[in-house]
Amino acid sequence: MNKDFLIKAQDLSFERSGRIIFSSLSLNLEEGQIIIIKGKNGSGKTSLLRCLAGFTPITSGKILWFDNEILPAFYSDKPLIAWLSHLDAIKGSLTVKENLLFFAKMWSVEPSIFNECIKKLSFEKFMNFPASWLSAGEKRRLSLLRISFCPAKVWILDEPSTFLDNDNREILIDIMNIHLKNKGAILCATHDNLKMLNSIEITL
């Protein structure tokens, strides 16, 4: 019996300015699974994630998202894929609460779930602060908070533990494992040794 893969990549190759970044790469992502992508700086981890997220065209190969060659919309009321870049997508002129409510309303997140995520990441005291006041670590936690209540089945995370201290890295791991237990799936590029459920590691 064939498995239903959330993302299926076959024989991917990617070149930039005549340089081969990666080639002949295949992977299958299924429910409850995390694929961890490792490699030195410049090895192509971010490029691979951007290709798998549909932001950057591959040079050759084939990608299926939910058994379809058409990429699902990211910014919709029912997203299938959530993206977390190594750069935090935060509007500094808005408060922390306004940044979060923009997505919570779009995704019709239940207030109880929204408040639970805020509490888990200890963000209650920051809610009325302008987002521009946050430190690098706090901005990272804000981005993780947004991901944590996103209803998307697949999370694509680029260096999610950047700027996090040990306590918040443990919270990150907990959030990711809960997503996997709830039949979600994760593609993650990281330098850290994350203790994850049902993980597969790819080194570029």
What do the PLM-derived regions correspond to, one by one?
Residues 53:
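Helix-to-loop junction immediately C-terminal to a conserved catalytic motif
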Residues 61-77:
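Conserved ABC transporter NBD signature motif
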Residues 87, 92-108:
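Q-loop/switch helix immediately C-terminal to the Walker
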Residues 111-127:
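Conserved ABC ATPase "signature" region
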Residues 130-138:
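Conserved ABC ATPase signature
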Residues 144, 183:
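Hydrophobic anchor residue at the start of the ABC signature
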Residues 155-159, 164:
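Catalytic Walker B motif of ABC-type/P-loop ATPase nucleotide-binding domains
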